[in-house]
């Protein structure tokens, strides 16, 4: 499609659409995990804050989404679909909903890619967060357990709505116009859940030990494209190695970014700090297993001691019980290897010997590990970020100085120098200037401070006391009922005397009136 976009705008638009597609998959799948997701706001975010949302990526979901996209982007005639289905322990399955991200030919050539498209994609992603929690599949996902699980499938191509049955409903999440077409995000969901009415799906403890997804297809088999939304237990052994976090965040390296990505940390998936072991030929990093996570899915190795360290996947997967025990082995004081028990500084973690097989130096490896990918609109300086790793579409968002937060003058301003005030000379007393006592307390004159609202007997008077006193002033004596009645009675009693005085001096009063005419 012929457009007037320059190469930079076209590159940014492709990045925005690709990253929006990946975030869309993350939002949909995380909404079907069966648990509430709570993220805390931050005034100075340090994670991947694309579209101004704290959506922490699950590496498995990102891997599946990138594999489904296969380098393509949603365009006219090519739609990205996320299918959510249900599968019971008896083997019955039913499609619940299909989310579709597509693009039509209606273009908006006047719109600006730099900010307008980005902000509208952010609003569309926020709308998706709300819509994913109002469809019937959300309530079913909250009740999944031993009886059934929720699966997801990502495919690229024509939308397949035949599995939803008759009478399904559709909802359009929103649209965003771009210079190359209009992005549309919609959902078709099943409303007939008669298949579910014959059973009671409750979270009851099993009579005997049952693997939660024993009847569910394994995550990446060649025969089935379905994947469970929830995490697998530690007893599974599929031999799957997911790409490193850095690889999963490859799409985040657009020009917007100035902050590293953050990964999912929840009750089911979490990384814990571990000691760093150093071998003679390889980098030996002990694997930390998280509760509820597949042991084989933790082939990602964790480099501790660096805040925001990136897990590194080994070159070759290790299988078998012996290999698992080797990965679980921890360093003890009796071992011959060097262990950083309390890695508190970067120097401890970088004490790694060179490989005897001619591999890359450990310094290069660590430098590769800690090159951080960054999110959007965050100008927090990070010492690991280099200018060569920043591909920013807006030059104004490039970090001015690559320095630590501790030395950032905006975070920790330097102490102001002690300079002599220009008013100090005018406050010097004449007696102290000629003396040689040198006492600093004699260099100033005591000023008698008398504010306008203060009184002589209460000095100084508090401003609050002054305000309260004049806010509720005493009542005027003339307005008092008792005093008014008393004065009226006195006037009536003295009225005859006043009339007698007037009659006596009536001629003088008449003469005065004539002078006024």
UniProtKB/Swiss-Prot annotation:
What keywords were assigned to this record? Acetylation, Autophagy, Cytoplasm, Phosphoprotein
Signal peptide start and end residues: none
Say if the entry is tagged with keyword Cytoplasm: yes
Post-translation changes: Phosphorylated by ULK1, ULK2 and mTOR. Phosphorylation status depends on nutrient-rich conditions; dephosphorylated during starvation or following treatment with rapamycin. ULK1-mediated phosphorylation of ATG13 at Ser-355 is required for efficient clearance of depolarized mitochondria.
Q: Where does it live in the cell?
A: Cytoplasm, Cytosol; Preautophagosomal structure
**Motif LIR per UniProt: ranges:** 444-447
Q: Which residues carry this modification: Phosphoserine?
A: 355-356, 361
Which gene does this sequence derive from?
Answer: ATG13
Q: What is the lineage of its organism?
A: Eukaryota, Metazoa, Chordata, Craniata, Vertebrata
- Assembly with partners or alone: Part of a complex consisting of ATG13, ULK1 and RB1CC1. Interacts with ATG101. Interacts with ULK1 (via C-terminus). Interacts with ULK2 (via C-terminus). Interacts (via the LIR motif) with GABARAP, GABARAPL, GABARAPL2, and LC3A. Interacts with TAB2 and TAB3. Interacts with C9orf72.
- UniProt organism field: Pongo abelii
Protein name (database record):
Autophagy-related protein 13
- Give the UniProt record's GO annotations in the biological process aspect: autophagosome assembly; mitophagy; piecemeal microautophagy of the nucleus; protein localization to phagophore assembly site
Function description: Autophagy factor required for autophagosome formation and mitophagy. Target of the TOR kinase signaling pathway that regulates autophagy through the control of the phosphorylation status of ATG13 and ULK1, and the regulation of the ATG13-ULK1-RB1CC1 complex. Through its regulation of ULK1 activity, plays a role in the regulation of the kinase activity of mTORC1 and cell proliferation.
Keyword Ribonucleoprotein recorded: no
Comp. bias (Polar residues):
342-358
Looking up InterPro entries in the UniProt record yields: ATG13 (IPR040182), HORMA_dom_sf (IPR036570)
GO cellular component annotations, sorted alphabetically? Atg1/ULK1 kinase complex; cytosol; phagophore assembly site
Carrying N-acetylmethionine, the residues are 1
